[in-house]
UniProtKB/Swiss-Prot annotation:
It catalyses: 5-[(5-phospho-1-deoxy-D-ribulos-1-ylimino)methylamino]-1-(5-phospho-beta-D-ribosyl)imidazole-4-carboxamide + L-glutamine = D-erythro-1-(imidazol-4-yl)glycerol 3-phosphate + 5-amino-1-(5-phospho-beta-D-ribosyl)imidazole-4-carboxamide + L-glutamate + H(+). InterPro entries: Aldolase_TIM, His_biosynth, HisF, IGPS_HisA/HisF, RibuloseP-bd_barrel. This is Imidazole glycerol phosphate synthase subunit HisF. It comes from Cytophaga hutchinsonii (strain ATCC 33406 / DSM 1761 / CIP 103989 / NBRC 15051 / NCIMB 9469 / D465). The gene is hisF. HAMAP family: HisF.
């Protein structure tokens, strides 16, 4: 049986972690690399770095971040944020990233996923899907969740798998930031309609929420940000709690 994964997510803007990090024992509380290294030591299975810097020099900032992360962190990590071409992906993987996350670029040009998986293999291509319920329909949103599309989330998830995504990062915008639990029903529904792993994101607030997303939500991995950044839940305790609930965790 495959083990479940716990993945802290770090949003990076202009080289600093955003979402207000308050680790007192870090020299620079805003340094994503130090924070990532700390999570790695604590037993995180993977890390996701999303660069939300709005600059023209996007690829340059991404690559610099990847190089620094790769030097200091020995667990797999995914980089995302403005990745839209074979060149972007090549630069990030060559700099040391294990996977890349593609979102709006796939919506703009779905064939990009075919190209990327053919060029690099689907094991390193993650498609991020931001979804929100609009009038009873789960619709995909682009541009950091700001622009609604007319794409149905389930149909889009299936299409992305068919085109070569190796993994889906599903963020429920309805749940994001609420700390009221993951979107388990939607996550489970998508999980039963695709065969690739689903990373659930949005809504983590308690350890029980993680139990639920793995059991009810059928997720393969759970991603969270602020509950880890603000030390509300510590990763070692979370993993031992989940193991105690009969959920297979990576040691």
């Amino acid at each position: 049986m495959l083990t479940k994964r716990i993945i802290p997510c770090l949003d990076v803007k202009d080289g600093k972690t955003v979402k207000g990090v308050n680790f007192l024992n870090l020299r620079d509380a805003g340094d994503p690399v130090e924070l990532g290294a700390l999570y790695s030591q604590q037993g995180a299975d993977e890390l996701v770095f999303l660069d939300i810097t709005a600059t023209l020099e996007k690829r340059g900032t991404l690559v610099e971040l990847v190089k620094r992360v790769a030097q200091h962190i020995n667990i797999p990590f995914t980089i995302g944020g403005g990745i839209g071409s074979i060149e972007d992906v090549s630069a990030c993987l060559n700099a040391g990233a294990d996977k890349v996350s593609v979102n709006s670029s796939a919506i703009k040009n779905p064939a990009l996923i075919d190209q990327l998986s053919k060029e690099f293999g689907n094991q390193c291509i993650v498609v991020a899907i931001d979804t929100r319920n609009v009038g009873g329909m789960n619709l995909v949103h682009s541009h950091g969740g700001t622009k609604p599309t007319d794409l149905d989330t389930i149909a889009w998830a299936k299409e992305m798998q068919e085109r070569g995504a190796g993994e889906l990062l599903l963020t429920s915008m309805d749940k994001d930031g609420t700390k009221a639990g993951f979107a388990n029903e939607l996550t489970a529904y998508i999980s039963t309609h695709v065969s690739i792993p689903i990373i659930a994101s949005g809504g983590a607030g308690t350890m029980e929420h993680f139990t639920d997303v793995f059991t009810l939500g059928k997720a393969d991995a759970a991603l969270a940000a602020s509950i880890f950044h603000f030390k509300e839940i510590a990763i070692p305790e979370l993993k031992s709690y989940l193991s105690g609930k009969g959920i297979h965790m990576r040691k």
